[in-house]
A protein has these predicted regions:
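Short beta-edge strand/loop motif at the mouth of beta-sheet-based domains
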Residues: 10-11, 30-65, 72-74, 149-157
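Hydrophobic ligand-binding cavity/cleft-lining segments
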Residues: 1-41
Length: 157
């Protein structure tokens, strides 16, 4: 990220599951596809490339590098448009932290190095809550949410 004004997005949720199940849901493409529609593909080793692959046509939407991988507690990756993969200055950073608390897990996602006011920052603020709500539903009920559905008509009062 360049020296332009930066911002970050932080989202915390509590999921009635284990850190291992959340880790698998994030890192195994066949599970990620269920709640994210797309899949995350990598060997998840430090220094490896990861790709966010569309479930419908297999095209790579996003790509980055694995910075830190401590299964099942912490994953840090860079994040950028697939075309920008070679240019690390255009990458943002995502940190996923999993902390067991009794019979649940506190999952905190911090997406930083975002350019303040950018389309990416806006997209992130809209996207992460949808993805993580669907992940929570899948792990707690066995069914993901269709968080990308359009709202039904509202009644004007």
């Amino acid at each position: 990220m360049t020296s332009e004004a930066a911002t970050k997005f932080v989202y915390t949720t509590y999921i009635s599951t284990t850190p291992e199940k959340i880790w698998q849901a994030i890192t195994r493409p066949e599970i990620a596809r269920q709640y994210w529609v797309h899949q995350n593909v990598s060997d998840w080793k430090v220094g490896s490339k990861w790709e966010h692959v569309r479930g419908d046509d297999g095209s790579v939407m996003l790509a980055g590098k694995v910075i830190e991988s401590v299964s099942p507690r912490k994953l840090v990756i860079t994040w950028g448009e697939a075309a920008d993969y070679p240019n690390e200055a255009k990458h943002t950073r995502v940190t996923l932290e999993l902390e067991p608390i009794g019979e649940m897990v506190r999952l905190t996602v911090t997406h930083d190095d975002l350019k303040a006011g950018s389309d990416m920052a806006s997209s992130i603020a809209n996207g992460w809550p949808r993805v993580l709500s669907s992940l929570k539903s899948l792990l707690e009920t066995g069914k993901p949410l269709d968080t990308w559905a359009q709202p039904k008509g509202r009644i004007n009062q």
